[in-house]
């Protein structure tokens, strides 16, 4: 990707910027500002946006913050790069009171790219710019349905032509909601008004399971078997859902046994119908096969995958790699062909707080993104290596210490929780945080 150029970028307070150089005067050489590592900003200094580092950058708020969301695949086509973009998200709130929570469908559209700085011109040109700015304003349509209790995780799947959302509630239930009507109304302002007035209060889940012994966060739909679902709770239990005729599910009451603490994340294999991975607060990552009895289904285990809780995992759709992020702030890449060894093939330590989300790029096999409680989103490429024969060396000691595979550091969010690459819009990354949603694409990916 020619745009990478070996440059690394950061942003703060919602404003992306290129890595900034500070002159320390006679006390030493200039240094590049590194998130979480300094040098600290001086009095009156702040980080400002460098729009040239971003192809696309938009923010949105929905009232109560959302701990989790998922991208809804649409019928607008794949490999969409032409701007403006349109996209659909399904998200769940974490409101202050249980009865104030909502499951939401968002339609974000008219998402234009970043613009070069304005040049000096006549008053007529200024008027044209104002009219153009009005036409370029991003738009948001929002359909909401009541949900009693905060929503810990949302995952969307298509059952044939029917979109559904699996929803983990802080009240200990897992519910499935039909999304067809919500998708219809966010495309039609008149239908949306009727829905909000007459229908939204009556929307109920099409299925609910209360067999978990408490709340949980882990949930994943099978990408190979429509309707097959896994849910994991904070009591170390994992349950398998099997779809039945008539739009219902049979949930196996026998949990998969192996973890000793909370199950934090689940990922189905993208290549095998019966295999899945799990990670836990017990520091382990496990590989399972549902063809075996739940008590004997754990086939492979790395007992000490991280120094502490393993928070998130992502199974590559293109390579036999599993990506993990933990409370120790590290990112690890596991080659599943060598998983028995218990050693990752790559370890990266850029985040200075727990990793909250990881995901492989859906089109580029070596690229992934991660978010952390340090309010950083990092983009990585395993294929990037410094050429020792080029003679090029990094003169700044701060940059020299950074992993070669680190492409981009995005900041400016508060309390980052989750991120996803858009599967139909290459390079577009979406995140949710206490500060709201951010949709962006960098020059690096």
From Swiss-Prot:
SMART domains tied to this protein: WD40
Modified residues (Phosphothreonine): 10
Bias (Acidic residues): 121-134
GO terms, biological process: DNA replication; nucleosome assembly; nucleosome disassembly; ribosome biogenesis
Compartments in which it is found: Nucleus, Nucleolus; Nucleus; Chromosome
Keywords recorded for this protein, A-Z: Chromosome, Nucleus, Phosphoprotein, Repeat, WD repeat
Keyword RNA-binding attributed: no
InterPro entries for this protein: G-protein_beta_WD-40_rep, Glutamate-rich_WD_repeat, Histone-bd_RBBP4-like_N, WD40/YVTN_repeat-like_dom_sf, WD40_repeat_CS, WD40_repeat_dom_sf, WD40_rpt
Transmembrane spans: none
SUPFAM superfamilies: WD40 repeat-like (SSF50978)
GO cellular component: chromosome; nucleolus; nucleus; protein-containing complex
Modified residue annotations for Phosphoserine: 119, 122, 343
WD repeat intervals: 211-251, 258-298, 305-344, 350-390, 411-444
Pfam families: CAF1C_H4-bd, WD40
Region (Disordered): 110-141
Gene Ontology molecular functions: chromatin binding; DNA replication origin binding; histone binding
Role according to the record: Histone binding-protein that regulates chromatin dynamics and minichromosome maintenance (MCM) loading at replication origins, possibly by promoting chromatin openness.
Record text on subunit structure and interactions: Interacts with METTL18. Interacts with CDT1; origin binding of GRWD1 is dependent on CDT1. Interacts with CDC6; origin binding of GRWD1 is dependent on CDC6. Binds to histone H2A-H2B and H3-H4 complexes.
PANTHER family recorded: GLUTAMATE-RICH WD REPEAT-CONTAINING PROTEIN 1
Protein name, UniProt field: Glutamate-rich WD repeat-containing protein 1
Originating organism: Rattus norvegicus
Gene: Grwd1
